């Protein structure tokens, strides 16, 4: 008999009466009145093994095994006795009567119990190998595998070709910092790890591969959050001779296919499409969570002439905004709740949080409870109540500041209230999956510090045809042929139609204050390629880590990556990054500069 004939979790009634050979780890060992029970675990699940003292040698071995010992057992599959069936296990109706037990490798005492759900992330990442044995991590990584498989299946069927692009490439500005790799052979010069395969996949379209994809690592040296890692995985795609709508349809179908085949979820037959300007106006975010049934009310124009400077000053500012968020039944919120929300919005730059409770709308001013009502005229109060559609028992929150502060703070408050216990109890958040496309993004953003425009996405995105004329006259008016797929408040994919004509690409570089010499130095290979009959093309990249995180219901993408980094970009398992030998630095022509010591 081979070392293993079955997986533990797959031993069921179909093997009754058969002798099996199993390998795995001891999840738990229990001694019940002279009979030893072992819960044996492998990647497919658990099976109960019964060790009877009638087999003395085997029983002696069983007495010595402990949790996480790696063992092999051979035994007979039989029904569990009446009253001992475990309906929570796939193998819960049977057990294996052990005939032979071999310890393949002993284990020291683990630093934690694998069924402990209250471990710190530091402990889990330091002992990641043990953490990966936990059923939830096994599930997450197998789900990740299935998502990748289904993405490949779909793309293969649609005629896409899997092509690898370089990992050692040229440093080009794409927003975040590059991870640099010094060249030993070319002293003083550096490769960069790719932030994306963006330029190479465009070159593949010029090279007539028509449809490309790869599931690939990308690298960005940026501050980390729950949904960010210094190295992450993209489902990266590019296609020729399709327009923006056709590209969206193609990849919308892919996401529907992946969700249906991996977690049996039917996403909407057609994803809604929302312009960027509408998303910001209604939700203060370009990745709105449509499950939350709360929206902004625009008040900027109505507050321009009020005496209340907190509202009128930003209402009259060039980049100011005044907006309201009506919360149905929010009158139930206590002053402590409101104070907590006030402190919360300060995180996003808000100076405070104005509010009005609507107790009896019919009474006008006298039916309202608020510290700001005394500063507003009756006409302004009436306008607020009418626009927000407030009813008795509601509360209205206000934000008045620079538009970015209003959007960030009120947008975060919308999500916090919507997903709170209060929000759930009052129907302010829906269950399920709410996908959408956000389109018509600004082509450029203005950087006040550098006094120039920067690319909102990347400088290879095509402007909308009707906005080409603005590239040289008014870049701020340009909208891009860019699109993001958003799901439950997460951007899971983003892409665009690309610039395929050299003269348009050069105009974009000029709008970004990238001169001809600099453009040739950094992007000459692209500009040259575009002159050889480059086809119209576009694409998209999906964050595999994010998609799997959402499907798994995990708190962080670190829970769906085998060996992730911390939020300080450290690997606690291998202790990377780490110092290197002076000899290695000399070979790379690198000398470390000691950090300056603070002055006494």
Swiss-Prot record:
Q: What is its main location?
A: cytoplasm
- Any single GO BP term: aspartyl-tRNA aminoacylation
Q: Which PROSITE patterns match?
A: AA_TRNA_LIGASE_II (PS50862)
- Protein name, please? Aspartate--tRNA(Asp/Asn) ligase
The protein's assembly and partners:
Homodimer.
Instruction: Write out the catalysed reaction.
Output: tRNA(Asx) + L-aspartate + ATP = L-aspartyl-tRNA(Asx) + AMP + diphosphate
Q: Which Pfam families match?
A: GAD, tRNA-synt_2, tRNA_anti-codon
What does the protein in this record do?
A: Aspartyl-tRNA synthetase with relaxed tRNA specificity since it is able to aspartylate not only its cognate tRNA(Asp) but also tRNA(Asn). Reaction proceeds in two steps: L-aspartate is first activated by ATP to form Asp-AMP and then transferred to the acceptor end of tRNA(Asp/Asn).
Q: Which NCBIfam families match?
A: aspS_bact (TIGR00459), PRK00476.1 (NF001750)
Subcellular localization, as worded in the UniProt entry = Cytoplasm
Q: Which domain of life, per UniProt? A: Bacteria
Class of the enzyme per the UniProt entry, highest EC level: ligase
Which residues does L-aspartate bind?
Answer: 174, 220, 457, 498
Give the record's family classification: Belongs to the class-II aminoacyl-tRNA synthetase family. Type 1 subfamily.
| Residues under site feature: Important for tRNA non-discrimination | 32, 83
What keywords is this UniProt entry annotated with? Aminoacyl-tRNA synthetase, ATP-binding, Cytoplasm, Ligase, Nucleotide-binding, Protein biosynthesis
UniProt keyword annotation of Transmembrane present:
no
């Amino acid at each position: 008999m081979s070392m293993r004939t079955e997986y533990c979790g797959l031993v069921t009634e179909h093997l009754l009466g058969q002798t099996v050979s199993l390998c795995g780890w001891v999840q738990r060992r229990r001694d019940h009145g002279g009979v030893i029970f072992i819960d044996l675990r492998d990647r497919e699940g658990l099976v109960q093994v019964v060790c009877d003292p009638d087999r003395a040698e085997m029983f002696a071995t069983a007495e010595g095994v402990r949790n996480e010992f790696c063992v092999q057992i051979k035994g007979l599959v039989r029904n569990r006795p009446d009253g001992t069936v475990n309906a929570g296990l796939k193998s819960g109706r049977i057990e294996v009567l052990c005939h032979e037990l071999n310890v393949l490798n002993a284990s020291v005492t683990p630093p934690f119990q694998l069924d402990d759900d209250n471990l710190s992330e530091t402990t889990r990442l330091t002992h990641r190998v043990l953490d990966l044995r936990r059923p939830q991590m096994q599930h997450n990584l197998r789900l990740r595998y299935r998502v990748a498989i289904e993405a490949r299946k779909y793309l293969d069927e649609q005629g896409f070709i899997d092509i690898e692009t370089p990992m050692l490439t040229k440093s080009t500005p794409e927003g975040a910092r590059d991870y640099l790799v010094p060249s030993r052979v070319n002293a003083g010069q550096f490769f960069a790890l790719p932030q994306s395969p963006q330029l190479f996949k465009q070159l593949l379209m010029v090279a007539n591969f028509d449809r490309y994809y790869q599931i690939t690592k990308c690298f960005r040296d940026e501050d980390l959050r729950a949904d960010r890692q210094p190295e992450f995985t993209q489902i990266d795609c590019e296609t020729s001779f399709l327009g923006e709508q056709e590209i969206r349809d193609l990849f919308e179908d892919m996401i529907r296919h992946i969700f249906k085949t991996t977690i049996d979820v039917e996403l909407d037959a057609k994803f809604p499409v929302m312009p960027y300007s509408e998303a910001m106006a209604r939700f203060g975010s370009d990745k709105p969570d449509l499950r939350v049934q709360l929206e902004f009310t625009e008040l900027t124009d109505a507050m321009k002439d009020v005496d209340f400077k907190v509202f009128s000053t930003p209402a009259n500012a060039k980049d100011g905004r005044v907006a309201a968020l009506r919360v149905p039944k929010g009158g139930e919120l206590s002053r402590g709740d409101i104070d907590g929300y006030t402190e919360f919005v300060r995180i996003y730059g808000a100076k405070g949080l104005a509010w009005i409770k609507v107790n009896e709308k019919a009474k006008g001013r006298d039916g309202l409870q608020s510290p700001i009502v005394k500063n507003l005229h009756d006409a302004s109060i009436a306008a607020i109540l009418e626009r927000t559609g407030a009813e008795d028992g509601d509360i209205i929150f206000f934000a008045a500041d620079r538009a970015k502060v209003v959007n960030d703070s009120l947008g975060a408050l919308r999500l916090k209230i919507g997903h709170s216990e209060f929000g759930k109890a009052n129907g302010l958040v829906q269950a399920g999956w709410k996908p959408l496309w956000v389109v018509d993004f600004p082509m450029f953003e203005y950087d006040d510090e550098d006094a120039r425009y920067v690319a909102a996405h990347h400088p290879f995105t095509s402007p909308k045809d009707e906005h080409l004329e603005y590239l040289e006259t008014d870049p701020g008016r340009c909208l891009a042929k860019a699109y993001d797929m958003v799901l439950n408040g997460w951007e899971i994919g983003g892409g665009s139609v690309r610039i395929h004509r050299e003269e348009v690409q050069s105009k974009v570089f000029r709008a970004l204050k990238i001169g001809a010499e600099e453009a040739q130095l950094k992007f000459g290979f692209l500009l040259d390629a575009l002159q050889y009959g480059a086809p119209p093309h576009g694409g998209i990249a999906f964050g595999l880590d994010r998609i799997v995180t959402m499907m798994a219901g995990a708190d962080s993408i670190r829970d769906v990556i085998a060996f992730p980094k911390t939020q300080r970009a450290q690997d606690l398992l291998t202790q990377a990054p780490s110092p290197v030998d002076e000899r290695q630095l000399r070979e790379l022509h690198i000398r470390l500069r000691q950090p300056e010591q603070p002055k006494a």
